[in-house]
Structures are given as structure tokens and as C-alpha cells.
């Protein structure tokens, strides 16, 4: 005879948590996220102590999170533009300065500016280095017709490139995602680069975590990313591009092999403020992008983690469901 008892387990959905400072000696909080389906492979996202963002499939070897975005068809430029605001910087030959648009939206959270704010029209300083700048002040400056500001070359040090920088022959001399240091700045000046697309990064309010992750990612294309994921899931086997792509699609985007469940979909939509009309029980690109944005917000001090032990995040597996699972295994 066999007795079957109802089981309580984690409810399907997406859950955000941190290690409570136990992993790193400094007590730094390392945030993580897990997507638990009703049936199928688990998908985890996690920060390491260096603020690099990784993902794992079924708790296997971790890979940089940009690898999964490349596998979804994004290129590096699109990855950066999805998560960050990009500003165009134009080099002015006469003044030897860089000119860019002044956008109050970049100052939603107050900062102390790291350089003088100079009006490009009249070359007057409107705010001195070290002064406080917030959205209200920025909006007033914009209303007073501050449209463009100028910066000297040293002021763009530390900013990240959103696109590859090419020389006059079309050769890539600096890859997208790298921050401008003295050496890179010298390359930009010596190659007479006139226009740069730079990421608006403010270390206090929005960190460069995804940009730093791009640096450690060895993959440069969708094919590279699919092959890298295949190697983790099927070590020792040499994949073709089609086999690698089929394996990746079957993981989370095939309703026969993956089922987030209706409860999981509702919880995911609710947590991430996604389209409530979406009732599909497979993952899509928008889900993964929204989850990564939430993870980045958590690291920047916005949003709250979930209580894994709360009974609202648990559900009862009935006897019928347990029997159904045994039949599926058979």
C-alpha cells in the first residue's frame, strides 16, 4: 500500500531576493532572482561581488547575462540602448570641446555635478562644479533656454561608449561598452573622431552593471551566445548553429516543454507591471528585459525583495497533480 500526501512547494512565478550579506566578507547585499515554472527549466539571475550580472539555467554553470540577450537576437548596441539613455557628443574644432544636449530627465535624482555646467551658446558657467543639480533646477535651466552644454575632453573620461568607434577606414578601434580612459581618449583625439554616442551614467543613481557585464562577455554575436549556452547544457558535444538554437528555444519558449502556469504568469505580470492581457504560459523577451530592469533597480536601491517563506508565495500540490506528474515521467 502507498499513502500519497499533499505537498506544499514554491508557487510558480518570479522571486527576487538577496543573500542578506552572508556571501561576501564586506556584508554587501548580492541580489538574485529566480523564475520558477510549473513545469520546465528554472532560470536564475544573480549579481557577483564585482557587480557583474550572471544567469544560470537549472543551477548549472553561470554565464554573463548579456549572453542570453545576444541569444535572443540583441546586438551590443541594442542591449545598451534598452537599459540606458544615450547622448550624442559632437566635437567642436574651434573650441576643442564636446557639445551635447542638456536633458533634465537625466537628473530625476539629485547629484553633485563633477564639472562646470557651461552653456554652449554664450560659453557662460550656469552651475559650478560640486553644486547640487536636481530635476527641478534642471527644468528651470532648460526653461531659461539652456539647450546644449559644452565639456572639455577630460569631462568625458569615465563615460561609456554605446557604439563601436571606427577610424576613417571603417576599422573598429574601440568596442561598444568600454569606458573612456586616458588611453581611449588619446585614440579618439588622434583619429579625429567627431561624434560619440555615450551612455548617461550617474554612479550614485544608476550604476554601469550591465556595461561591466558586457566587458567580461566573450560572445560577440547570436551564434556565439547560442553555442556558449549549448556547451553549458551539453558539455562535450559539438553543436551546429541550428541545434544550439533549437535547444535554447525549447528551454523557455516552447509550450510543450515549458509551462509557467496561469498562476505564474499572473504573478509575473503583477510583479513587473507587464501587460495583464498576456496569458501565455511561456516566457518572452519582454519578460526577461523587465526582470533585468527590476534587478538593476534593486542594485541601485529601488524596489523591494520578496519574502520567500511567506505563504502567499507557496502553493499546495494536490494528490491529482502528483499522480499527473508521475504519469508524465512514465
In which residue ranges do the predicted regions lie?
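N-terminal non-catalytic structural scaffold regions of very large proteins
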Residues: 1-330
Amino acid at each position: 500500500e502507498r499513502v500519497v500526501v499533499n505537498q506544499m512547494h514554491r508557487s510558480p512565478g518570479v522571486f527576487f531576493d538577496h543573500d542578506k550579506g552572508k556571501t561576501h566578507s564586506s556584508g554587501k547585499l548580492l541580489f538574485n532572482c529566480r523564475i520558477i515554472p510549473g513545469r520546465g527549466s528554472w532560470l536564475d539571475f544573480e549579481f557577483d561581488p564585482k557587480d557583474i550580472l550572471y544567469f544560470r539555467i537549472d543551477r548549472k554553470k553561470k554565464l554573463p547575462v548579456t549572453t542570453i540577450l545576444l541569444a535572443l537576437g540583441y546586438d551590443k548596441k541594442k542591449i545598451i540602448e534598452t537599459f540606458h539613455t544615450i547622448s550624442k557628443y559632437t566635437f567642436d574644432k574651434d573650441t576643442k570641446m564636446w557639445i551635447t544636449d542638456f536633458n533634465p530627465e537625466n537628473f530625476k535624482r539629485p547629484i553633485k555635478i563633477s564639472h562646470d555646467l557651461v552653456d554652449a551658446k554664450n560659453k557662460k558657467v550656469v552651475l559650478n562644479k560640486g553644486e547640487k543639480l536636481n530635476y527641478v533646477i534642471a527644468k528651470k535651466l532648460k526653461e531659461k533656454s539652456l539647450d546644449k552644454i559644452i565639456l572639455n575632453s577630460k569631462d568625458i573620461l569615465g563615460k561609456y561608449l554605446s557604439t563601436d568607434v571606427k577610424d576613417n577606414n571603417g576599422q573598429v578601434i574601440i568596442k561598444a561598452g568600454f569606458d573612456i580612459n586616458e588611453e581611449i581618449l588619446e585614440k579618439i583625439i588622434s583619429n579625429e573622431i567627431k561624434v560619440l554616442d555615450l551612455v548617461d551614467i550617474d554612479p550614485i543613481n544608476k550604476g554601469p552593471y550591465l556595461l561591466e557585464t558586457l566587458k567580461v562577455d566573450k560572445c560577440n554575436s547570436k551564434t556565439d551566445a547560442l553555442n556558449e549556452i549549448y556547451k553549458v547544457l551539453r558539455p562535450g558535444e559539438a553543436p551546429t548553429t541550428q541545434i544550439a538554437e533549437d535547444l535554447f528555444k525549447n528551454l523557455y519558449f516552447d509550450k510543450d516543454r515549458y509551462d509557467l502556469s496561469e498562476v505564474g504568469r499572473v504573478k509575473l505580470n503583477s510583479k513587473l507591471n507587464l501587460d495583464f492581457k498576456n496569458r501565455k504560459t511561456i516566457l518572452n523577451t519582454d519578460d526577461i528585459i523587465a526582470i533585468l530592469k527590476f534587478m538593476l533597480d534593486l542594485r541601485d536601491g529601488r524596489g523591494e525583495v520578496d519574502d520567500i517563506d511567506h505563504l502567499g508565495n507557496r502553493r499546495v500540490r494536490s494528490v491529482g497533480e502528483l499522480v499527473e506528474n508521475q504519469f508524465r515521467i512514465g
